[in-house]
Amino acid sequence: IFDAPQGLIVVDTGRSPMHAQAILDYAKQRHRPIAAIVNSHWHLDHTTGNFDIRQAFPNAKVYASTAIEGALVGFLNNGRAQGDKVLTDTKTSEGQKAQLLRGRYRVDHPDTLRPTNPVMRSGRVTIAGRRLEVHLAKFAATEGDVWIYDPASRTAIVGDLVVGLVPFMDTACADGWSKALDEVAAVPFQTVIPGHGDPMSRADFLSWRKAYNDFVA
């Protein structure tokens, strides 16, 4: 979460109600509105909370790539049959069912998943009055991944281009992902915030990039 002159900038909003509520609680504690959301990519564990936040702050802008459009008619739509199996499986907990239905509702009502301000190319962008470097990586972890470099804090927020676990390849292009990691390495960051896992130093990131390239070689 970034401070900006016009309010808070939230990068990714999580999946569960607890994720969204934690963000809303933080805004309340700070006595600041949420002015903008940046979605690093369309995966529902990064975007489902858009609905909750925009209910509370309907004027919040959403910055994201347009890759959600292909996902809605492709990956997310194709996963519906698998979701039906999970919902009818007696081993599925009520909590898991509620989470799946929450995500499905967002897919069926996708307005809050779509960007109000589409990111079409990399460049410097003023978001809620704060100047940030917004990058678009095409055909990487998804068809369009958005990552941010903040020169003031020398922090790169990269979504699932970096994760603490094994990379999720189901929606990925391995070569494009490797190129995106090279683009991240080219900025003078001190800290990387991954899509999952703990913050990384530059040395940690370079080690992860090498492991990724070895993994897909």
Please provide the spans of the model-predicted regions.
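Divalent metal-coordination and catalytic microenvironments
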Residues: 2, 12, 27, 41, ...
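Active-site environment of divalent metal-dependent phosphoester hydrolases
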Residues: 17-18, 42-47, 69-72, 141-144, ...
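Active-site metal-binding motif and surrounding structural segment of the metallo-beta-lactamase
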Residues: 18-64, 187-188
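Metallo-beta-lactamase
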Residues: 73-137, 143, 151-152, 181
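Active-site-proximal loop/helix segments of hydrolase catalytic cores
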Residues: 131-188
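Conserved beta-strand hairpin/beta-sheet module of binuclear metal-dependent hydrolase folds
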Residues: 1-29, 146-160
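Active-site neighborhood of phospho(di)ester-bond hydrolases with catalytic His/Asp-centered motifs
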Residues: 11-14, 35-43, 63-66, 156-159, ...
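Divalent-metal (often Zn2+) His-rich catalytic cores of metallo-beta-lactamase-fold enzymes
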Residues: 149, 155, 175-217
